[in-house]
Amino acid sequence: MEKESLLSLFSSNPDKYYKVSLFDEKGFKRQNCRLCGKFFWSINYKESCPEHENYSFIDDPPTSKRLDFVNTWKELSSFFRKNDHELIQRYPVVCRWREDLYFTIASIVDFQRLMNGKIVFEIPKNPLIVPQMCLRFNDIENVGLTGRHYTSFCMIGQTCNADAPGGYWKDRCIELDHAFLKNVLGIQSEEITFVEDVWMGAGAFGNSLEYYVRGLELGNAVFTEFEGDQSNYRTLDSRIIDMGAGLERLSWITMGTPTSYDTTFGPVINKLKNMINIDIDLNSELLSQYFRIFAEKYSKYQNDIKLLKINISKELGVSYETLEKTILPYETLSVIADHTRTLLFAISDGSLPSNVGGGYNLRIILRRTLALLARFGWNVNLEDIIDLHIEQLKSMYPELKEHSNDVRTIIQIESGRYGSSKERMYSIAKSMLSSKKSPSVEHLIKMYESDGITPDFLLENGVIENIPPDFYLKLAELHTSHEPKQAAVVETVTGVRPTKLLYYENASIREFDARILKILNGKYLVLDQTAFYPRGGGQEPDFGYIEGVKITDVVKQNDIVIHKLENASKDSFSEDKIVHGIVDNSRRVAITKNHSATHILNSSARNILGSWVWQNSAFKEENYARLDITHHSALTREEIRHIENTANDVVQRNLPILINVFERSDAENRYSFRIYQGGAVPSNNVRIVNIDGWDIEACGGTHVNKTGEIGLIKILKSERIQDGVVRLEFVAGTNAVRYVQSQDSQLLHIAQSLGSSKEKVVESFDKTSGENELMKRKFRTLVNKFSDSMATIVSQKATTLRSGLKFFITYDDEIGDDYYIALGEKTIDNDPFLVYVALIQDQERIKVIAFVGIESRKIIKASRIAKEVSLKLGGTGGGGTDKFAQGGGTDKSKVQECLKNFENLLTSILDSSEKND
C-alpha cells in the first residue's frame, strides 16, 4: 500500500476523514496548495500550505506566554490533566518491548506490542498524556545546523483508545489541541493551519492532521482506524488516537529565538559557554536572520551546506568567514548539548556505547562530541555537561539523578578509550594527508567502523574540507533497527489444537499419557498434551521416551509442541493412539537448576557491576550454562569472585521462587521493563518468575521452588565475546560440585608432584618456580659462553660460495632453539659474510632458524631463506627480517634432503635475486 494512493483515497472524501466540528465552529476552510497539491484547513485564504512558509515566528512569537522547555511541559500537562487525561511517566528510551527496535522512536511506541507480525495497542490509562523522550539517529549531521533537528527529543503523547471507557475521537482531539494552542499559549486561531496526511504501519493505518503555526509543525494527530490494505480493509475494534507534539517546538514557538536549541538547552548552553569561556550573543540579530533564511532555503541546498552558508552571507552583507566565525561555535554548542542529553537518557535506561546494535549510534555521537571539543580546544568533561542536563530536567525526569554515577562511569570509560586511540588516528590522518586523495563517504564509513575515526577528527586535522552531508545518515542506517530472530521449525503444523502444557500445571510431573494428534515425516509427534519442555528462551529441551522410543528433540511452533523420535519403526505410532511418555528426570533437574542460576547470576552481575547490565542472551543445557551480559569491559578476577559470592549468598538464603501469570500491561506496571531480560514477550499474558524480589523476569522456563535447591553456582570462565558483551560460563547443582571435586583432585595431584600438601601447594609452587627460574638463568649464561667458543668453529666449517658469501647449516633433535638463536647471533657478528641456518626438531614440527651477516644481506635476506626452507619442509613460509627469520614445517622426511641440497637452494635464491636486480 502506497502512502500517496492512500492519501488520495482519504482526500477524495474530506468530510468523512478530515473534517471535524472545530472547523465549522471556527471557520476553517479546506484549501489546496498550489505548490505541492496538498490539502489543508485554515481560516484565512493561503495559496500554499505551511510546508512552504518561512519561520516568521523568529523574533516575533505569536504567543502570549514565553515558556522554556520545562515550563512548557508544566503548562501542557496541567491543561490535559484538567481535561481528564492521566499523566504517566515516560517509558525507557531503550525499547525492550519491541524486538524490531533498539530505541523508542515515538511516543506511541510505548503502547505498541508486536504479535504475529501485527501491532497491538496496549494503553494503560485512557486517555493519557506522556512526556516521552525519543531517540532517532537519521539526522545526526543536521543537529546544530537547522535549529530544529535532534537525536533525542521529547514527543508529547496524547493517546486515547476511542472505543474504551473515557475514550474520544477526532472532534474532541482537535478541539483539545486547538484549545491548548489558543487558550494556554495564546495563539490566535487564524495562525493555526491543519494539513491532511496519512499514517500506516504493520497492517494498520489511518488519516492524520498535522498542525502548523507560522511555518513550524507543532504536532500531528494520527487517527489509527483501519487494518488491512487499501482494497480490503476493516475498522479496528479499538480505534487509536496518537497525537504526537514536539515539546522542543512548542517551547520554541513561544520564545521566537533563533533556534529551538536556545529554549531546549538554554541553561545548559549558557553554563557551557561560561565553562569554556566563549562569548556568543544568543539573541543577536545576525543569528535570527541567519536561521530564518537557513530554514527557508535548507531543502534546496541540503547537499551543499557550505554553498548555502555562502549565499546567506551574501544576503546578509557579511563575509562567509565572519558568518562562520559566529555560527560555527553556536552550532557546535548545540550539537554537544543534544548529543550529551541523548547519551544521558540512553545510558540511564541501560544501553551502552559499543560497536554493535543500538550502542553503535551512541558511540558515534559520543566520539563526535569528543572530536568537536578537541577541534575547538574546549577543555570540558562530558560528565560535567551531563550534570547540567540532570539539573535542568530534574522536575520532569527526576530518575536521571539516580543513574548519574553509572552514566559518569560509562562516559569516562568511553572517553578514555577514544583518547588512547588518538595516536593511531593521528598516524592514519598523516598518511591520508600524504596521499592527497579525497576519501569517499564509503571510505569514511569504513574508517569509522575499523578505526573509530570520525570525519570531525579528519576535518580538525585537515584531511577533509567538509563532512559529507549524508555520512552520519548512512552510518546510522546500518544500525537503526534489527530483525527479530526467527526460530527454526520442522514444518508448518496446521489443523491441530494447541498442546496442553503439563509442565506448567505440575512442574514435578515426569510421566504422562497423551493422544497423538499428528505424525510428521514419520519421526515427529504432535500430542494433545505433554510434560516434555521444548527448546525455548535459551533452555534446551527435555529428553526421554514415548512408548520406549527415545525423544531426542522437542520444539514449539506457536502453541504446538513437536517431539522428535529416534529410529521409530513405521508401525510404532498412529494418529489418535494413546501413548505413554517419560521425561528424563536427571536432565530436567540439571537444566532447571542451571536456569534458576542464570536469573540469580544476572541480578548478581547487575548489583556488582552497574545498572547497565542486562541479559544479552543465555543458554542452559544439562551439563553447562552460559549467560551473556551487557558490560563495557572484560571482568577482573575480583569482579568474577564478587558475582559468584553474591549469587551463592542468594542460594544459601533459600529464597522462594514464585511464578505467576499477569496481563502484560499489569506486569510492566508492577515490575518495569526490567522483566524483559530474555527479550519481548509476544503474548497478552506474561509469566513472571520472581526470586523473592532479588530478580524478577518474564520467563517461560522451568525453575526450582527455592534457591537452596540449586546447591552451588560455580563460574568456570569469563570472556568478552564482543564489544559491550561479556560471557559467563558456569555450572550449578551437582555439576558444580563435580567441578569443584575435579579441581580438588587436580590440586592434590599437583601437590603430590611437588612433594607437598594441598595446604602448602602455593608455597611449594613458588619455591619450585624460583628454582626453575634460577636454572633458566644459569642455562642462558652457559649458552652464551658456549656459543662464543662455537661461533669461531662454525665460521671455520662454513662453505664458501661466490662473492665471499659463506653458509653453514645444521640439524638437532635434542637441544632447544634458544641455543641456536644465541649461536646464530654470535656467528654473524663474528663473520659478516656468513649465512647460518639451523633445523631443530620440536615434537612433530621442524623449526627453521636463519641468520644472515651484514655483508651477505646485500645480496640475500634471512626472510627469503626461511621461507624457501620452510616450503621444502611442508610449511607455508617463514617470517622475519633481513637479518633474522624463522619458519618451519611438519615433513620430517625432508630434513636430510634440505641439508644435502641447501647449497643448491642458496645458489638458486642468489640467481633469482641477481636476475631481479
Q: Where are these predicted regions, by residue range?
A:
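Interaction interfaces in information-processing and related assembly proteins
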Residues: 1-2
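A glycine- and charged-residue-rich anion-binding loop/surface
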Residues: 5-20, 24-30, 37, 53-917
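Cysteine-rich micro-motifs
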Residues: 42-56
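Cys/His-enriched microdomains
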Residues: 31-34, 47
